[in-house]
Amino acid sequence: MGSKGVYQYHWQSHNVKHSGVDDMVLLSKITENSIVENLKKRYMDDYIFTYIGSVLISVNPFKQMPYFGEKEIEMYQGAAQYENPPHIYALADNMYRNMIIDRENQCVIISGESGAGKTVAAKYIMSYISRVSGGGTKVQHVKDIILQSNPLLEAFGNAKTVRNNNSSRFGKYFEIQFSPGGEPDGGKISNFLLEKSRVVMRNPGERSFHIFYQLIEGASAEQKHSLGITSMDYYYYLSLSGSYKVDDIDDRREFQETLHAMNVIGIFAEEQTLVLQIVAGILHLGNISFKEVGNYAAVESEEFLAFPAYLLGINQDRLKEKLTSRQMDSKWGGKSESIHVTLNVEQACYTRDALAKALHARVFDFLVDSINKAMEKDHEEYNIGVLDIYGFEIFQKNGFEQFCINFVNEKLQQIFIELTLKAEQEEYVQEGIRWTPIEYFNNKIVCDLIENKVNPPGIMSILDDVCATMHAVGEGADQTLLQKLQMQIGSHEHFNSWNQGFIIHHYAGKVSYDMDGFCERNRDVLFMDLIELMQSSELPFIKSLFPENLQADKKGRPTTAGSKIKKQANDLVSTLMKCTPHYIRCIKPNETKKPRDWEESRVKHQVEYLGLKENIRVRRAGYAYRRIFQKFLQRYAILTKATWPSWQGEEKQGVLHLLQSVNMDSDQFQLGRSKVFIKAPESLFLLEEMRERKYDGYARVIQKSWRKFVARKKYVQMREEASDLLLNKKERRRNSINRNFIGDYIGMEEHPELQQFVGKREKIDFADTVTKYDRRFKGVKRDLLLTPKCLYLIGREKVKQGPDKGLVKEVLKRKIEIERILSVSLSTMQDDIFILHEQEYDSLLESVFKTEFLSLLAKRYEEKTQKQLPLKFSNTLELKLKKENWGPWSAGGSRQVQFHQGFGDLAVLKPSNKVLQVSIGPGLPKNSRPTRRNTTQNTGYSSGTQNANYPVRAAPPPPGYHQNGVIRNQYVPYPHAPGSQRSNQKSLYTSMARPPLPRQQSTSSDRVSQTPESLDFLKVPDQGAAGVRRQTTSRPPPAGGRPKPQPKPKPQVPQCKALYAYDAQDTDELSFNANDIIDIIKEDPSGWWTGRLRGKQGLFPNNYVTKI
């Protein structure tokens, strides 16, 4: 049922172009190539979503798509999946309704490799559920927390990698908890394996967590002073990888979003200040370097100790002591004693980095706990879980973190394989349908290789064993691990070793892991000395982040990072198994992160390892389409009189009647207990074709008539209102009197740098690039914007100083409030010049769309002043100048514009001293009105007159040519200047005096920024043993030996090549880009030819093209 209680068939909402198939179950040929080709067709037409049954495939567009607004939310709310094109909102709505109706917990598993768009998909699901669910003030508060948790956790947990500019470096399972009525009244976040090592080291070309760069870019002057914030390259930790800026990330703006998120979640201002204090403290901690003195470590420059000690509220000397030495407990003969051990340079650097990593991890845990406390509820009822976890990834050097990340992805792949197959199997059994199981690669063998406890032990068990037996030994542990792996699992088909590590044949391809640091990172133990140091802080907040009981914690073996992630992964699997699962399979189309860039081999590789072909086969399993009887009857009821408008009888018999009415063979369908199953896509297309024949004719007649009526009424009214302003007062131009009004001739949606000058909620009535003449009558380009309140003139200037020096940026040249306009002056001739008279000074402008502009200005003027806009018509116009205090043109003064009868439709301008002479030929008579021509477009040949097919206007001049002989400046967008930043942070909570910020040390050899030696790891990975397994379980495609029929030869038609880009000025025209090839259908002496481009037929100016 629709939202208003009236059933709407899904064809009613398909007012969109179709590209490929929406559901790949309906592909006539199931091969990896056909799947890739279908995804490519849809991707190139900006359809990023495709179904495989109930599974949603999402291809990352690397740009903002237009179909995520209020209109789409309303369209998908309460609608069945097949009623609208594939969309993530359909899946989110299905989850939400199933939870309410079935009273079952739901979850969505979002999987895909790094950079495939998983985090964005999770955001859309949470925002949709937040939007469609009801509730009062408390519920709205929970919704706000749910939405604001994303920017906060992204700031502290996301980073730029070589594969993804906003890569999640932690896993997150977000449970949105609901009341029985469906209102979100609570929530819970479980986070997994934050990649804290990113704080102190990362691959070349990557960044640390976003918050460090946000703080440096967005902090106020007061914050920068108190936190010791300076340039990014001052901090050793940030300079490691040589990457500071990201093209599509505005760190300054996102810093404000992070602060706002902390406010919404309820983190006190004092705690916010301390969180930022720790972030800055980590940066300053990294600047402490060490030198070797007698084989031991000493701080190279002690002045670098002062600021981190100050920010963390600890004693400077104690910090120095704990970084260069360690207390070790020793037992001998039943007695224990503490030994003071001095560290070497390598150990001191490790200790410093361990403290920095621990501080960031503890702050991250504090933020997660704060979010959970803000959403906590007494008891759980129903929930929807959203799993957004790090994607499968391969880097130049893959360490322990990548090993854990890829293990979790193996577990998720296993869930997908088992649950989709299990759910499909159960449906056939319940409906009494026979089916043949589909073979597939089960990656359980890889999961067991990693996590098995015994017989044989898995990699994680061997790793924990080595860490336990060599707990006090740092050197040689990694090589011992490698030797044990070779000895115990070296013969495993999904495992290989090499001199510095090992290789796992994952489901997504072979990954080579470097053993360096494996054991140390798995131990993940923070030295007691560092905990004692942080517990000595005079800041209670920092103390609270280290709550360990040091005496109690000395007993027992500490839990390793590997065992933690293994337990978290298995707990996650158990949680997901208790929910009704939904799936989003994200695909990354390229490594360039650019829209419309399609790497065929990369996509095909993902299609293969995600098992999409097997998924389609399982879904079809002999029957490509299935639908419950009621829905099937509703959809195809129009096919027979007996079923329309409703079937009177048993639903199953009604379905059988419909199938027999289209003469479908009995072996092409089967009726289950509650559903009809149709075998081949062609049989379904037969039903669709029959239905279309019934509806199509009626729909076209209604649509055509209605559009014709509305368009004619709208355009006639607009043209006549505009024409009345000039009627009997000014000659009209032949090429504009009958044109349609567009309003936006700049494309404001694509130019946010212009929107910054307009109020947030101001509607832009008119936008055009016009010519503005100065006191010397020299023409310059200005963007003219008209809103209900103001008129704006925007120009461009080079920045002369500051960080943006030399860049050309938009500048607001003039802003006139509508009510301050005194009058508008025009000539009586057909020119496009007019003068805006304002109290201070006038503006002399020229616009080919002057009539449209003046009609809109007149409306807004009347709304504001309750008076009509004064329009003055004369062939001698007075121009009042702006007062200046420089040069020979000082003072205000005036100028005069005189109009004379000339020749042709193009105005000729001749400035002379203080007078501008304008000559132009005669136009249409002053009493001319727009003709009431048909607004519907005729795209074929017509036997009528030329005027029926061609506009009454001259073909436009090619780009670069101005009608007055002046070269036009091309419109070039530039990034807007960054706005000012606010700060509401309080002062630091420490009794220490702020130390001076030490000068940056000269870069030593171990601090040189790295550059990637090779980008081979970005190539499609070797599929390994998993790929071989997939090939052996694949069945041959049907009719594999038959050659394809030869395509029909295309008809030969004359063609032309576009010399310049052209934007259609009317609804019957073609838009095209330079170098486009256009089929010529008809040439006309008027200069307007008829052509066809990309399936669309229309008029275009012949002076913009050349024949080929």
Swiss-Prot record:
Keyword ATP-binding carried by entry: yes
Feature: compositional bias, Pro residues: 1035-1052
One annotated GO biological process: vasculogenesis
Residue ranges of domain IQ in the record: 695-724
Protein residues bound to ATP: 112-119
SMART domains to which the protein is assigned, alphabetical: MYSc (SM00242), SH3 (SM00326)
SH3 domain boundaries: 1051-1108
Main location as per UniProt: cytoplasm
GO MF annotations, alphabetized: actin filament binding; ATP binding; ATP hydrolysis activity; calmodulin binding; microfilament motor activity; phosphatidylinositol binding
Region (Disordered) location: 919-966, 993-1053
Gene3D superfamilies in the cross-refs: 1.10.10.820, 1.20.5.4820, 1.20.58.530, Kinesin motor domain, Myosin VI head, motor domain, U50 subdomain, SH3 Domains
Pfam families xref list: Myosin_head, Myosin_TH1, SH3_1
Protein localization: Cytoplasm; Cytoplasm, Cytoskeleton; Cytoplasmic vesicle; Cytoplasmic vesicle, Clathrin-coated vesicle
Record-linked InterPro entries: Ie/If_SH3, Kinesin_motor_dom_sf, Myosin_head_motor_dom-like, Myosin_TH1, MYSc_Myo1, P-loop_NTPase, SH3-like_dom_sf, SH3_domain
Family under the similarity heading: Belongs to the TRAFAC class myosin-kinesin ATPase superfamily. Myosin family.
Assembly and interaction partners: Interacts with CALM and F-actin. Interacts (via SH3 domain) with SYNJ1, DNM1 and DNM2. Interacts with ARL14EP. Interacts with CARMIL1.
Task performed by this protein: Actin-based motor molecule with ATPase activity. Unconventional myosins serve in intracellular movements. Their highly divergent tails bind to membranous compartments, which are then moved relative to actin filaments. Binds to membranes containing anionic phospholipids via its tail domain. Involved in clathrin-mediated endocytosis and intracellular movement of clathrin-coated vesicles. Required for normal morphology of the glomerular basement membrane, normal development of foot processes by kidney podocytes and normal kidney function.
Protein name from the UniProt record: Unconventional myosin-Ie
Organism expressing this protein natively: Homo sapiens (Human)
